[in-house]
Every structure is written in structure tokens, then in C-alpha cells.
Amino acid sequence: MDLQRVRALRGPNLWSRHTAIEAVIYCEEDERSIKGLVDFEIQLRTLFPKLHFSNAVSSHEHISMAHVIEHVVLGLQAQAGCPVTFSRTVKASHEGIYQVVVEYSEEAVGRLALDLAWSLVSAARENKKFDLQKALHELSNLDEDVRLGPSTGSIVQSSVERNIPYRRLTDGSLVQFGWGSKQKRIQAAETSDTSAIAEAIAQDKELTKDLLHAAGVAVPMGKVVDNADDAWKVAQELGSTIVIKPRDGNQGKGVAVNIKSEEQVRTAFEVAQHYGRKIIVERYMPGQDFRLLVVGDRLIAAARRDPPQVIGDGKSTIVQLVEEINKDPLRGDGHATPLTKIRIDDIALATLSKKGLQAESIPIMGQKVVLRNNANLSTGGSATDVTEDVHPDLAASAITAAKMVGLDICGVDIVCEAVYKPLEEQGGGVVEVNAAPGLRMHLNPSYGKSQPVGDAIISMMYPTPENGRIPVVAVSGTNGKTTTVRLIAHVLRTHGHRVGMTSTDGVYIENERIDTGDCSGPKSARNVLMHPQVDAAVFETARGGILREGLGFDACDVGVITNIGEGDHLGMSYIETVEELAEVKGVIVRNVAPSGHAVLNAADPMVVKMAKTCRGQIIYFALNSHHPVISTHRAQGKKVLFREKDEIIAAIGSKIIHRIPLANIPLTDHGQIGFQVENTLASVGAAWALNIDWKLIEQGLASFVSDAKTAPGRFNLFKHKGATVIADYGHNPDAIRALVQAANAFPANNRHVVISGAGDRRDEDIRLQTQILGEAFDSVILYQDQCQRGREDGEVLALLREGLVGAKKTKDIQEIRGEFLAIDLALEQLNPNDLCLILIDQVEESLNYLQKVTKP
């Protein structure tokens, strides 16, 4: 076996809507069926006893080593606790090549699972040992390390259930919800609306206490000190049991409670100063420790927190009892698990010492030993849900505390005897207000039921029916994508949207280019959706990006397929046929939202077949108003667009909805340029699907300018000494045919064409381009461009020349090296009333050159 390529498919893709690892594997002839591999399966199942082959692989005859890798990768992740179920192996047309696709929940885990699966299968093949438990432990640890923690994870899960898109921005807990101008962000239990001032107030415990006291909320009395002598002095003034804690602390770090003696005060002060210079000394409030979670202006959850403790068995030391408790799989070292491991640290030792105990002491049977007096989960405490027991007045105190500090999500710590009574009746009070509160105790309490805190946070950020989505239009096809994308974006701008757009010539935000080059892939789409000044997005969605990484979004409102025709880029990335190419481009149709539309070319059979995969509605378009697909769709009472004489017609069933004169659409040159009429139909379909007002659609079509600046390489017209020059990036047979048809609408004495060929296309596709041109042009200039894309020197020119053999119209054939030299040669030979079609390769450079050298 040979692992030839590994890719992470980070969005909906050719295989599924799941994120997945795609591996291209070459199998030797004897590896294409494990039936002939003696004892291989026995050894494989010895190393991996729970391996399961899916029903799709019915017998050993069909199980290749690539299939084995597939199922081992999936099985390892599943046994490590990852929520994965999808996998698939497809035999490519190349001999011995298989494409293996396996779902992952975390990319790093999926990649590691592939590495471990390769090692396991190799060990089985070579009759060697493999430590399965070590591999599963490694996968499980990595998954725990990289996946979202329980607090952030609960919020993300709630967003998924509400169909709110999300994107993880870092390896940590920073997550974006929504797209463009509707985006919001969280980091754990902080939101993009959480006030920095409020967080600073919450961090200053003395200031917080003053604000709450002013609002009539009960708080413990106390003072701030910066040395141990003053701490003891304040303790004496308070005249009771006290609490010592850092003024700017968090998560219960450095907190000591129930302090009485001078020695205890000084020890606690020293520990607290590890976490802050200023220390609070305040009156100790007897009672139980409760955490109330306030989201917005509502109390969402409440939990009683109990300090970390062990129960003696009469034979184990306290250290041993702690070690036994820490074996609980619910306890971990950080915040990824519901509970945190108990630590024997200085505070724990001091707490034991007050009871006359040490870490090596052996408690008697049934003796409860508390290891610290604060009950934070982050220091090993446990929680019991008491949400339904909270008295309305006590809830009101917690909400007032949150509002006084100014936090949108707030953890209010209250000490009192019971939550079913108001604070005033029991002498309790608010001891702390926390920004970014942990949610674990409410999601997975040790006792009681889980509370839907993630739902509450998402509902605060996006009240129903908001979902954080902006209109998203995805455009794919063989030809016409870029022009269609630009026209749709222009119409949306006419509607008042701030539009983000991606295409093969850049990324545009509000009509300003922010990135250059081919930006028709998922990375550019994600960048647009992350931009806060985008109200609507239009994406050119090319074959390469879909194959390389999948889509840059989970769903689109409109999916437009301009055409498939004879295809392009065939023979690349294991896509050999037009049918396979249609499967790739149809990914956007399969991922149209159920409430959305697919806008499909009714005249292209490959495009029409995509309709059955769409979850939304279909709008068909065609130049021919009587096309059978158009007629059938109309008969079913559905939406269609077509050309009728000199108008574009929008109809639902037999009812005409709107008419647009082609004379009012400059892009089509009064309807003379057929492929631009098709591009316009597709664009109007997208705008119609988004419920844009027809007057605004007409305004957008009338004001759209297609020139070398606004649509570079898309039928750009120049004048040179009385001749017409057309520059276009057409580079496949269908595009050439459309260009020939459009050029024929321009009267000319002589017709000239300048062409090169893309070396990464099939031989027959390169030949066919000049075969088509040879029927329509008097003279042809063949040029070799800078990049041959893997071809030998002169090889592309030879193929282009072969296509002109027997040409009916072409009489003059010239060859030259260099695109600009070819342009110069063509312009020199032009006479007034001639026409020259220049098929450019370096779009921006060639257009700039033409603007300089053409002389109207």
C-alpha cells in the first residue's frame, strides 16, 4: 500500500455533509482483495477485536486493504469516544487507486486515527504486535485536549439545534456564531456583548461589594489590606469568623474560609498573596455555598456546591482516598470533564491541619473529611442542582447583582442556609459575582437534573426567530460563473445590501477588492462570512475548492448551476467524466437550505439531474421558452425563467410574473450575446429566489457595466483602428462555442483569433477548441504561454495545430511564443471593420496591455 494524499474536508463535500478525512491509497494487485491474504483477517481481528465491516462491503471479494483502512480509522475513533458514524471507500478509475473517506469530529483526531490505522493494518499484515489500548488512549487524550470544553460545547450544541451557523476561530474556546453583519462571538461563557468594564468590576471584589450594597443586596462586611498585620487587625475588628481571599482572584484560588486564629489569618494571607497583592478580609457567612446563573435578565440555573471531601474507610490514608475518588472518569485535570480532580495543596493541608489531620492520616469508617472550605468545582468540589427550589426574592437579588455589575452572563455566589427563603430572612448574602462563569455544574451536576444553560445563552444572543444567517448565493458550473456572480452581487447592492463576493479574480467587500488571485475556494468564502460589514454573500464555487476542502459554508439560500456541457478540467483529481464533474458541482445543490432555491439550466441534462438532490425549490431557466423541462415545470405550477423574443420572462406556472426587456440589459447587447442572456437569466433567478423587488432587479441589470475593470476576461470589448477586439478567458470547448456564436453577431470583413491552450486539459479538449475556431475564423494565431502545466515544450502548440487540420474557414495559421507578442502580431494585421477574438491566459496583465496598445 501507498498513502498518496491526505486531505481534510472541512465542509459539505462530494461524499457527505460531514467533516471528513479523505485519503488516496494505492493498493498492489494482491491487496485489492484480502481474500488472498493468508491469515490476514485473523491477525487483524486479533489486534482489533471489535472491528466491524459495514453491510456495504458484502464479502471478502470486495474488501481491499483500502476498505480495511477505512473501517479501522472509523472504529478507532468510535472506540475512543468520538461521535463518528460515516465512512466510504470508492475505487477510482486509475488502476489500484482508492479514495477513502472517514468522518471526524476533530481534524487532529481524524488525522491521528488514520496514522494509527495505517500502523495497525501494517502490523496485522506483517504479523507484528500493536498496542491497541495505547492507541485508543492516545486518541482519547487528544480528543479531550482539542475538542470544545463542556461550557462552550453546550452553547455550540444549542446553536446547532437552532440552525445557527458556527465556526471555531482558534484551537481554544473562541467561537463565532452567525455570518457577516449578524455574527456574534463567545469565549466560554463570555459573549461579544459582555462588557469589559463589567468584567473589570467583577474582578474587583471590593468594588463589586460596594455596588451591591448600594443596590440593597446583602453582602458580607470587610476591608482590603495589603499586609498580614492589617489582616489580623481587621479580623479582630470584625469580631467573628472571617474569610480571606484575593481582591482580584477567580475560580476560588487563594480563598480561605472559617478562619479564627491569628496563625490561621497569617497563613491564609500568605497563600492568598500568591494570587494578588491586595487581600480582602471579610466576615464569614455561615451556611451553604450556592451558585446562581443569570443570563440576560433571567435566572437560568442554581446549584449547591459542596467542598471536596472524602469518607474514611478505616484503613486508607486521606491521600489514598483522594486518589480513589480521582479515578472517577467524570473527574479530569482541567475543564473538559464534568468534575475536576481533588488536589492536596497548601490550602488542603492547612484545612486538614485545623482539624488535627495530615495527608497521611487514616480517617475512621464513615468519617467525613473536608479538604478545603470553598466549594468551587475547579478545586474539586461537587454540585447539586437546586434550580426549582430558588425563592423568587432570592432570584431577584441575584439578577440585581448581575445588573449592577453589568454582566450579560453572570455567576452569582451566595452563601445562605437555604435557597427557598429570601436572603433577608436567613442572614445570607452575595459573596462574589463572576464573569465568564463555568457552566459544568449546571450541565452535569453531581446530583439533580441538567439545566439547558446553552439554550438560554443562545436565545439571549439570537432571540427566536433570528438565526444569525445572511443571504448566501453559491454559483458553480463550467462557464459563466464569474459574470453571474458579479451580476448577482450588483443586484444585491442595488437592494441596499453590503455584499461580500468571491471569484476567480479576487475577494470583494462592498465592491472593494481585498484579496487577489483565484479566490473561488472555501477559505475565501469563510473569510467573507467572517467579515462584519457583509449583509449578503455571493460565492463563485469552483470544482477545485470543493474537491480540496469542501464548501466554506454549511448551507446556501440559493445554489446556481450555469451549465455543465462537455465539462472542463476532466482527467484531473480523479474526475474523468462529465457525469463525475456534475457530481462535484452538484454539491452546492445538495446543500441548498430546505427553505432555499436551486437555479438550474433547463437546457443542460446534467444540470437538470441535480434537481432531485435539492432540499429546496427549483427555478429552471432556458433561452427556449418551449424547452420540455421548462414546459413540464410550468405545468406543475413552479417557477421558470426564459427568453421570449426580446424579453426575459419570469413565470409561475401559466402566470407571467414579470417581463424585462433585453434592450434594458447592456450586458446582453440587446440580446445579441446569447451566453450573456443565459448568465442574466441565472442571475435574475437568484435575485427572485431572494425575494428582491422586481424594480430593483431591473435597476441592477440596467446599471451593470461589464468591462475589463468590472468583469475582467469576460467578453471585454476594445476598438483598434476601426476594428473590434474581444478579449476573453474562454478555455474549454463549450466556452469557445459560445464565444463564436457571440462574435458572429458582430459584422466583420475578416475574423481573426488568438489562442493558446491550458496544458492540464486532455489532448482531445485542446484539439477540439481549435476545431471549433477553424470553422469560424479566417486566421488563427497560436501562441505558447508561460506556464505549460506539465506539458513538454511545444506540445500544446502541436495539439492546437492538429485541431486545425482540415479547417473549413481558417486559411492562415501562425505560431509565436509569448502572449504579448501574439497580441502585437494580431493587432498589426487588423484592418478597419475586422474582428479579433483574443483568448487571454494572463487575464489582468493582458487586459492592461491591451488598454495600453489599442488605439480606438
Regions found by a protein language model. Give the residues of each.
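Flexible active-site lid/hinge loop adjacent to a nucleotide/diphosphate
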Residues: 511-629, 664-668, 733, 737
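Residue-level signal for inorganic ion chemistry
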Residues: 159, 413, 502, 540, ...
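ATP-dependent carboxylate-amine ligase
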Residues: 3, 11-58, 473, 486, ...
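Conserved N-proximal alpha/beta basic substrate-recognition cap immediately N-terminal to
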Residues: 96-237, 250
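Active-site nucleotide/adenylate-binding loops and adjacent lid/helix of ATP-dependent enzymes
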Residues: 67, 160, 184-344, 392
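Adenine nucleotide phosphate-binding catalytic loops in nucleotide-utilizing enzymes
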Residues: 575-582, 586, 596, 615-737
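Walker A (P-loop) phosphate-binding motif
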Residues: 464-506
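ATP-dependent carboxylate activation and anion-phosphoryl transfer catalytic cores
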Residues: 1-161, 298-320, 347, 351-354, ...
